[in-house]
Amino acid sequence: MEERLVSGDVHREDVSLEYSLRPKFLHEYIGQDKVKDNLKVFIEAAKMREETLDHVLLYGPPGLGKTTLAAIIANEMGVHLRTTSGPAIERPGDLAAILTSLEPGDVLFIDEIHRLHRSVEEVLYPAMEDYCLDIIIGKGQTARSIRIDLPPFTLVGATTRAGALSAPLRDRFGVISRLEYYTTEHLTQIVMRTAEILHVDITAEAAVEIARRSRGTPRIANRLLRRVRDFAQVRGDGTITFLLAKEALELLQVDRLGLDHIDHKLIKAIMEKFGGGPVGIDTIAATIGEEAQTIEDVYEPYLLQIGFLQRTPRGRIVTPIAYEHFGMEVPKQ
């Protein structure tokens, strides 16, 4: 699968820059007002009681700021942040090594927590509830269990698939917050902030244009800004204007709703070859040369979000607003 400019997943080029662009405290964090306001209360209450913050689960599409919020929680609590991911913790012993190295009050961030192996999850249960580890030593009849006390800590779990979490794990989180797609207004503020950090001159109109095409996702907004900056330096005088941003994004094949050439190919295949649907996912996959799972997990969510596609028991259907966007007439039934 090719790396898409409008993907919310982390690209290699994002890694080095994202750290420098991340806000460090809640008052610097733009958007997600409900999540932010609730976290502010929970953090202040925990600090007043001189306790650790309850375990926090953050879920939502990629690129919305889950990792950033984990770091902010640690900063606001004045403690260290330890970062790992579900796939990186292969065995219970790996998790035990991480947990026993924590200092009192530390924040442990586990990204993609839905990908934890079940045997690892079971080690996590007593650690989250009672701040202890139950470890089996020996085998067979000589096996015995010993309990190791852990310092109080806060687990922050992040996932794009909350439904994939087991109920016992999900129930152990005291704070569960869903991150929503960002408004154009908030994304415009993020683009302006990033431009200032990167020392890029940009007009307010250009920032709005980049924000509109960013699919509600800060990571995409920052990536598009960097690409448009290249055009401003090579084809302009270094300043990103509305016209330059519009031209650059069209050359990058990102349309006014943030759809790229793959989105166009998928929608147009259903329109032109199957009369707008309904058509099965496997048929679509064979038509555009992609795996059905990739279409469901990567391409469809945003098209469903903006109302261009509908899932029905008989298959996928393209909606009238999608026809309008592409300047085509809705076929008569």
From Swiss-Prot:
Q: Where is the protein found, in the record's own terms?
A: Cytoplasm
Q: Where is the stretch described as Small ATPAse domain (RuvB-S)?
A: 183-253
Q: Which GO terms describe its molecular function?
A: ATP binding; ATP hydrolysis activity; four-way junction DNA binding; four-way junction helicase activity
Q: Does the keyword DNA repair apply?
A: yes
- Function text: The RuvA-RuvB-RuvC complex processes Holliday junction (HJ) DNA during genetic recombination and DNA repair, while the RuvA-RuvB complex plays an important role in the rescue of blocked DNA replication forks via replication fork reversal (RFR). RuvA specifically binds to HJ cruciform DNA, conferring on it an open structure. The RuvB hexamer acts as an ATP-dependent pump, pulling dsDNA into and through the RuvAB complex. RuvB forms 2 homohexamers on either side of HJ DNA bound by 1 or 2 RuvA tetramers; 4 subunits per hexamer contact DNA at a time.
Sequence similarity: Belongs to the RuvB family.
- List the protein's name: Holliday junction branch migration complex subunit RuvB
- Taxonomic lineage from the root: Bacteria, Bacillati, Bacillota, Bacilli, Bacillales
Gene that encodes it: ruvB
